Swiss-Prot record:
It comes from Rhodopseudomonas palustris (strain BisB18). L-serine binds at residues 284-286, 338, 440. The lineage of its organism: Bacteria, Pseudomonadati, Pseudomonadota, Alphaproteobacteria, Hyphomicrobiales. It catalyses: tRNA(Ser) + L-serine + ATP = L-seryl-tRNA(Ser) + AMP + diphosphate + H(+); tRNA(Sec) + L-serine + ATP = L-seryl-tRNA(Sec) + AMP + diphosphate + H(+). This is Serine--tRNA ligase. Pathway: Aminoacyl-tRNA biosynthesis; selenocysteinyl-tRNA(Sec) biosynthesis; L-seryl-tRNA(Sec) from L-serine and tRNA(Sec): step 1/1.
Length: 481
């Protein structure tokens, strides 16, 4: 979320950075919405001030036994009481319109981010290692996994539909080993604190990290049908009894509860009940980890705060129709180790480089060839100021192999912190917004693919990387045995 005051102070600078993403200038539109909000606030405050003044004048008129003036003032106060709810509503509507507009605007790229339209304009920052050579034609992971009878897409489709997989035996254990290895390195050597967060979160958490409202179609949400129906019945009963203040506060925080009550006359009970009971499946552990500091004021002596989690992640992949339809590259459910850092503004640049090096290190120990890309302005994520992608070499992809993304490391500045109201207090005692960073450390499912394809043997077996063998009970080769 952007600061409207900063936009007002320098709209040209805002638009100069914003248009680097290939978007049209927007500062004046935001200023117009803020002007409308200020105008509505002024009208409401003037009406309230006049009501207060008139109420006082009524007492003065009565003391002076000026009944005519007292009656005129009482009539004025009565009229103000009638008009003020509409003025208050106008303030709320104008404030909501500005907040909605600001919430749908992406972060501004840093000055050193290369300009470009899409992934073809990303810049190679570095390489590590070399591509492996084979005396045979490497196969894709799904052919190897199915031949081993340890990767079953058909069974997964019967259970859940497309873009799911069932892993068995050695490959299931290998995926678990990769995740545990990543987690151990990050916690024991890189200074991250392990967190086991919920996989279901509220709207507020998804808004805080900027998945909502812009990317709702890419998410999975769940709602308990029985709770919805029960809550509907209780709502209707209290509405009929003209006692809406006693609607049960079952699942919702006070701030949201009050807002919903205000909208009773405009919304159907079914819609409200669903909103009260729904939760979102996390698309990444970035969401719960980053939101752990929501509505907090941290001591800057404790920063940077580094957290990591190994979780399942869920994505609808609404924009991926027809892409990567075979194999495990693009799944609705996948495992990932996430890295999150919360820093001061002065620390965030160095922390970004450090986070990238942590993600690189686990791939180096797996002896996988990869390259690091600096994403251009047209390919950056919504909340990012600057992003590095790590693309690992997968010899079984396409004709002759391909680089595929396995990690994204992004610095977000105070963009998410403003949405979450996450601040820190320094030596001067004044609170200020923190900076947030997130990165994959790395995607476990894609790391599994990379290991399968890079460590495949001519007979279809998979050699287990040395660093993973202790997690596999000493197993050195996964075969169909």
């Amino acid at each position: 979320m952007h600061d409207i005051k900063a936009i007002r102070d320098n709209p040209t600078a805002f638009d100069d950075a914003y248009t680097r993403r290939g978007l049209a200038p927007i500062a004046q539109s935001l200023i117009d919405k803020d002007d409308a909000r200020r105008k509505a606030i002024l009208a409401s405050e003037q009406a309230q001030a006049r009501r207060n003044a008139a109420s006082k004048e009524i007492g003065d008129a009565k003391k002076a036994k000026d009944n005519v003036r007292a009656e005129a003032l009482m009539a004025e106060v009565a009229e103000l009481k009638t008009t003020m709810p509409a003025l208050d509503a106008a303030v709320k509507d104008a404030d909501a319109a500005l907040k909605k507009a600001l919430s749908e605007i992406p972060n501004l790229p840093l000055a050193d981010v290369p300009e470009g339209k899409d992934e073809h304009d990303n810049e190679v920052r570095s390489h590590y290692g070399v591509k492996r050579s084979y005396a045979f034609t490497p196969k894709p992971h799904y052919e190897l996994g199915e031949a081993l009878k340890q990767m079953d897409f058909e069974a997964a489709a019967k259970l859940s539909g497309a873009r799911f997989v069932v892993l068995k035996k050695g490959l299931a254990r290998l995926e678990r080993a990769i995740g545990q290895f990543f987690l151990d390195v990050h916690t024991e050597e890189h200074g991250y604190t392990e967190v086991n967060p919920p996989l279901l979160v509220r709207d507020e958490a998804m808004f805080g990290t900027a998945q909502l409202p812009k990317f709702e179609d890419d998410q999975f949400f769940v709602g308990n049908g029985n709770n919805v129906r029960r809550l509907q019945q209780e709502m209707r009963a209290t509405i009929e009894a003209d006692d809406v203040k006693n609607i049960p506060d079952m699942f919702v925080p006070k701030s949201k509860y009050d807002r919903l009550l205000e909208n009773y006359l405009r919304l159907e009970t079914e819609q409200i009940a669903l909103e009260l009971t729904r939760r979102w499946l996390i698309p990444t552990a970035e969401v719960p980890l980053t939101n752990l500091v929501r509505e907090s004021i941290l001591d800057e002596k404790e920063l940077p705060l580094r957290m990591t989690a190994l979780t399942q992640c869920f994505r609808a992949e609404a924009g991926a129709a027809g892409r990567d339809t075979r194999g495990m590259i693009r799944q609705h459910q996948f495992t990932k180790v996430e890295l999150v850092s919360v820093t001061t503004p002065e620390q965030s640049k160095d922390e970004h480089e450090r986070m990238l090096s942590c993600a690189e290190e686990v791939l180096r120990r797996l002896e996988l060839h990869y390259r690091v890309m600096t994403l251009c302005t047209g390919d950056m994520g919504f909340a990012s100021q600057k992003t590095y992608d790590i693309e690992v070499w997968m010899p079984g992809q396409g004709e002759g192999g391909a680089y595929r993304e396995i990690s994204s490391c992004s610095v977000c500045g105070d963009f998410q912190a403003r949405r979450m109201d996450a601040r820190s207090r320094g030596p001067d005692g004044k609170p200020r917004f923190v900076h947030t960073l997130n990165g994959s450390g790395t995607a476990v499912g894609r790391a599994l693919i990379a290991v399968i394809e890079n460590y495949q043997q001519e007979d279809g077996s998979i050699a287990v990387p040395t660093v993973l063998q202790r997690y596999m009970g000493g197993l050195k080769v996964i075969s169909n045995g």
